[in-house]
């Protein structure tokens, strides 16, 4: 069942009150959404793909939690929070929010790439729904 999206402002306020906040010089957020262009077209350049009208999305919470724990082992990373939607989603719906906090920009950028990449590749299942015509 589709969930209500969290407030990034609230997440940032919570992060800045967290015990790790004095060590953090940068927070970086990611907001993945359902797009109309099929993954096959965007990632692989396949021509003639139908437009996406939605997606069925699910995830393995234990795997996500394990990946978050691994993210804390990266250099300079002191804060990580993830929210994932689920169920049948429409174009424009939020799929994922990620907030990463760390000491310096290169560490935080690398950690965001690492965390989002591992979640997308190891923890979620996405089934695109296409237009019929």
Regions of interest found by a model, annotated:
Residues 1-94, 101-133:
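N-terminal, polar/charged subdomain of small-to-medium soluble alpha/beta proteins
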């Amino acid at each position: 069942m589709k969930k209500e999206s969290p407030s990034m402002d609230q997440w940032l306020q919570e992060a800045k009150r967290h015990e790790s906040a004095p060590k953090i010089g940068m927070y970086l957020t990611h907001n993945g959404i359902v797009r109309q262009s099929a993954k096959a077209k965007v990632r692989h350049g396949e021509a003639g793909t139908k437009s996406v009208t939605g997606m069925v999305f699910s995830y393995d919470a234990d795997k996500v939690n394990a990946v978050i724990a691994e993210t804390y082992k990266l250099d300079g990373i002191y804060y990580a929070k993830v929210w994932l939607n689920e169920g049948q989603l429409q174009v424009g719906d939020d799929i994922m929010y990620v907030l990463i906090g760390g000491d310096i920009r290169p560490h935080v950028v690398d950690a965001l790439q690492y965390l989002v990449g591992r979640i997308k590749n190891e923890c979620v299942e996405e089934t695109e729904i296409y237009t019929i015509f």
